[in-house]
Amino acid sequence: MKQVMVLWLMCLCCMQVKAHSTDDNAFHVGVLLFEGAQAIDFVGPIEVFGQAGFRITTLSKDGEAITTAMGLQVTPHQAFSQELQLDALLIPGGNVNDRLLNDVTVAQWIKAQSKSARYVMSVCNGAFILANTGLLDGLRATTIEKAFNSFEHNYPNVTLARDKKFTDNGKILTTAGLSSGIDGALSLVAKVRGAKVARTVAAKIEYNWQPNGGYIRGKMADRVLPQFDNLPKDVALLSRVFHYGDETTWHKGYTFGIDESKTELLSTWLNQQMTNAGWQKAGAKNALAWSNNVNNTIWLLHVSLKRTSETELTAHLTLTQQI
């Protein structure tokens, strides 16, 4: 019985989780927090940095608690301080609105910290906050896929990397959306403490880290889909049911509000949209199917419509790369 108890206690010791370093000489990462920040954008990297033995300080402009995009309340360690000496600064994404982007105090603090910090890294659409300071001008950057066009439009002096999960400009680093912050954090650990330490951390948190690959949202098949104009006035989008796939196949599902007598209106609109985008009709005459050659690769899009009531129907879009 004593032997069993000893083994049990040993297992408990092995399972203990240590907090981040409190050593003043440890590599020091500051994490910007703001109202509406996306939790995974900073919690994931904090876990990585803590496991790597870094010291971490979370900061908000006034030191007050913030509420994340998912409703989690987080109290930072402190308010902004010009005296704080950081080795790296992490800028997460989330509800990045005009109020935040136009906040002079936030922008000036980031620029001030960037002068002494060895590294500055944005996660997800935190790239907008970083780009707004001018620190990304002339550099390559990435962000969450759904913000690509907006980012490119708003920051023409920044080269957008649509096919990267992580960009490394030496001092300035950016990552794609959400969980990509973990990849960026591991890459920063590799720069500071070496690849072996970074891989050890990845193993400890049971994360399949692929520094030069993995799931890259900007490479997924839906990148070739055209952008549709507004729906006809008698058709209403009720819900987006699903949206998933990989590099060769993509599926989208929608529910539309449309009277049974006007079903043909949606089919006609789809045909017009695809034709305007340069796609060619494929299959039978009445089939909702089109093909297109994109960078010497043939893609086929098929749409199936199914009426669920007199006033609603579902649409399933299937995009496939042809071999």
For the regions a language model picked out, list residue spans one by one.
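Bacterial N-terminal signal peptides
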Residues: 4-14
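Extended, subdomain-level signal for the structured scaffold at the beginning of enzyme domains
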Residues: 19-120, 128-133, 162, 186-323
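Residues that mark the start of a beta-strand
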Residues: 26-30, 140, 171
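A conserved active-site-flanking secondary-structure segment within enzyme catalytic domains
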Residues: 136-165, 204
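Amphipathic alpha-helical segments enriched in hydrophobic/aromatic residues interleaved with Lys/Arg
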Residues: 163-176
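Active-site-proximal catalytic alpha-helix in oxidoreductases
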Residues: 173-186
